[in-house]
């Protein structure tokens, strides 16, 4: 009779053999604070083969920005390899195209090493760029028009550009933060150049070049909002104010894309004397809830996502379901 060890060894051997042949790609997505990180780590620890976690978070790529981006601890990242975390300085630009290029290279390396890739994050455009292999070259770049928009933002305020985006592409406006100047300008630029809303271009689905299995983690909205409030309070206790103060004192100004991220802009306003800390915290909670709503809107339109509701379900039970589906998908 074959024992448990023999079964596990067979699973490990077969899964390793299938990785290079079938190019599996597992993704765990969902709104901020829902528990993606914890679930992904538990799944990676329990899978019978070595697993590398690729971050699909547009903020975790920045160094020196740890608390506000809720990065996994260094201890966890030492135990389980994490990629595209702490890659660039806060004053460096990191585009979707650059993300896609790095992520594809990491994927290929994992396949060569017969390691299973686990994509985890809530930045929908990053997720889609990798799993559906969108061509970044098909989105035109009009430098002159971009400069005009940048000047307009400086002269009239970013709010004016955001209102324009709401008129020409309400779907994109719903998914882009009103403070995200780079993406607002990019969306307007694509519309100007092509006459087609960027949201429509992004809705086109291509067949994934990977053997894709994508899970969406969700929960009751009120419970999610409570978790967001708790997370923000924890970030303050962990030293978010000091983190933002350090960044500002070291020359990382508010015009940088990185400093427009949730937590950094709100706390910077407090540090610059625009309002008190309590107001900053309330702003951050409100903006994070709005962000979570936009994330859910983005992922809900993807028919490939297998949704798992953890409102009344223990995380370990969710992990069991994910692992069972992974083994069924890639072992048979």
Swiss-Prot record:
Which is one GO molecular function term here? ATP binding
Protein name as it appears in the record: tRNA dimethylallyltransferase
Stored Pfam families: IPPT
Q: Which UniProt keywords apply?
A: ATP-binding, Magnesium, Nucleotide-binding, Transferase, tRNA processing
Q: What is its EC number?
A: 2.5.1.75
* GO BP terms: tRNA modification
Query: Which cofactor(s) does the record list?
Result: Mg(2+)
According to UniProt, the reaction catalysed is:
adenosine(37) in tRNA + dimethylallyl diphosphate = N(6)-dimethylallyladenosine(37) in tRNA + diphosphate
Decide whether keyword Phosphoprotein is in the record.
no
Self-association or partners: how does it assemble?
Answer: Monomer.
Q: Record-annotated residues binding substrate?
A: 32-37
What species is this protein from?
Natranaerobius thermophilus (strain ATCC BAA-1301 / DSM 18059 / JW/NM-WN-LF)
Looking at the UniProt record, the site noted as Interaction with substrate tRNA sits at 123, 146
């Amino acid at each position: 009779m074959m024992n448990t060890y023999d079964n596990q060894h067979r699973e490990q051997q077969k899964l390793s053999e299938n990785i290079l042949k079938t190019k599996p790609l597992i993704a765990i997505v969902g709104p901020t604070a829902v528990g993606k990180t914890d679930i992904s780590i538990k799944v990676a620890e329990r899978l019978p083969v070595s697993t590398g976690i690729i971050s699909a978070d547009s903020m975790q790529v920045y160094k020196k920005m740890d608390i506000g981006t809720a990065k996994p601890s260094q201890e966890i990242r030492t135990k389980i390899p994490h990629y595209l975390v702490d890659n660039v300085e806060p004053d460096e630009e990191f585009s979707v195209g650059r993300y896609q290029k790095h992520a594809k290279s990491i994927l290929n390396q994992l396949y060569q090493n017969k390691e299973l890739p686990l994509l985890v994050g809530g930045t929908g455009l990053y997720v889609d760029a990798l799993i559906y292999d969108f061509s970044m070259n098909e989105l035109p770049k009009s430098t002159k028009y971009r400069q005009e928009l940048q000047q307009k933002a400086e002269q009239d305020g970013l709010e004016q550009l955001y209102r324009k985006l709401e008129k020409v592409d309400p779907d994109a406006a719903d998914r882009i933060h009103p403070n995200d100047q780079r993406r607002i300008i990019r969306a307007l630029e694509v519309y100007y150049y092509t006459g087609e809303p960027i949201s429509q271009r992004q809705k086109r689905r291509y067949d994934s070049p990977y053997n894709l299995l994508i899970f969406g983690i969700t929960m009751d909205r009120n419970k999610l909002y409570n978790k967001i409030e708790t997370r923000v309070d924890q970030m303050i206790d962990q030293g978010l104010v000091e983190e933002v103060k350090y960044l500002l004192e070291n020359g990382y100004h508010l015009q940088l894309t990185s400093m427009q991220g949730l937590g950094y802009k709100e706390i910077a306003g407090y540090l610059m004397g625009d309002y008190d800390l309590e107001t900053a915290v309330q702003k951050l909670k409100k903006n994070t809830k709005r962000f979570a709503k936009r994330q859910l809107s983005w992922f809900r339109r993807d028919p490939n996502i297998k949704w798992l509701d953890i409102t009344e379900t223990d995380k370990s039970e969710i992990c069991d379901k994910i692992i069972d589906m992974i083994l069924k998908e890639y072992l048979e």
